[in-house]
Amino acid sequence: MLAFFVRRLASLIIPRRASSRFATALILLGTLAAPAFAHETLKLDAPKPQLAPTPPMGWNSWNKFGCNINEALVRKQADAMAASGMKAAGYQYIVIDDCWQKSRDDNGNIVADPERFPGGIKALADYVHSKGLKFGLYSDAGSLTCGGRPGSAGHEFQDARQYAKWGVDYLKYDWCHTGTRDAEAAYTIMAKALRESGRDMVLSICEWGNNQPERWAAPVGHLWRTTGDIYDAWEGKKDWSHGMTNILDMQVERWRHSAPNAWNDPDMLEVGNGGMTTTEYESHISLWAMLAAPLIAGNDLSTMDADTRRILTNSDVIAVDQDPLGQQARRVWKEGDLEIWARPLKGGEHAVVLFNRGKAPAAITVRWDQLNLPAALKADVKDLWSKKVAKNVRGSHGGTVASHGVIMVRITPVL
């Protein structure tokens, strides 16, 4: 017990971005007092498993359902992912967000809410796995989760072992009720716990970009949030949440910090939740694909309409997101409400989005020199939404872009 209290003391007295050496010293003091916890230091002995060579794809319960979740709902989402074409398109994780927890038992083990999840988490994970999918859970680095359920602070290794027994493949780890804990130290402890659990698990760092995760998160987690939560709107701010284009603007300079197995995460998709138009949802997923963002659907998969399914399963757009080169797009041009975003792809190809934030249709053209390509280069240009292909294009490519819309193309040099 002394080890636990010393570790908690460290989390309370060390300010954010403070020296991790001091944190390590305090935690080691606690471990010396209790040899059973001697492995609970900040040092990551095991390398980060290569579980996300491309951005993770899946579904998460929070955007649509919040705390209104239960076992039957999650099973229904798994059924829909497997049957709707989502699984075939590359989506694989079913992630239960906050409010699945109820309490801890007398031994400190985390207990699922028995009314919402009467069959238990292990049986639910087994069901998801039976569909050829992977299973994810949520926890928090604080004493409580954002929804007021038990957090993992002081129980990191115990919880990680429990997750492994249940068959968890993915952990979203939030940042509520953390007081003055140092984010790097807190997430490193959970990363170490997961790596020592005996099961590979993706670690999704969710501290909202408040603690400069681009400086420390790459060796620790597989993806890290860059902003507060998204909400289902074209633009705006609501409490700690941001509209889609507001979050996009926060990604402009982050391309330097994204790479395979270490992804910037601008938060989940809102496609199909009703707060934006079909055109805006096409822009949403197109821009997230350009950002090499995790594609985590946040709608009700069991009731989605044909347009939502079409948008979420566009194989050409998904292929850009999942390109193995893993380079996040840069905004290479902006004039008023008009923008061009571009990213190189493996094999010398390029993906480009012509983006119109304005209230009226507008002409936008990308020049080859903006892509560091010679003007004389011939290329085939495929529109990833209309599926039309322009052959042997030289120098530039453009079109009229709808209000709040995109033209997204893949440019393939003709050899």
Which residues fall in each region the model found?
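Glycan-recognition surfaces
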Residues: 155-158, 195, 200-300, 321
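Bacterial N-terminal signal peptides
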Residues: 23-33
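Structural recognition of the beta-strand scaffold that forms the well-ordered cores
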Residues: 55-61, 90-97, 134-139, 169-174, ...
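Carbohydrate-binding surface patches
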Residues: 288-291, 296-298, 334-373, 404
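C-terminal beta-strand-rich structural cap/linker in extracellular carbohydrate-active enzymes
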Residues: 392-415
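Aromatic-lined carbohydrate-binding/catalytic grooves of carbohydrate-active enzymes
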Residues: 77, 81-180
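N-terminal module-boundary/linker segments of secreted carbohydrate-active enzymes
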Residues: 39-71, 75, 80
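Bacterial N-terminal signal peptides that target proteins for export
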Residues: 5-25
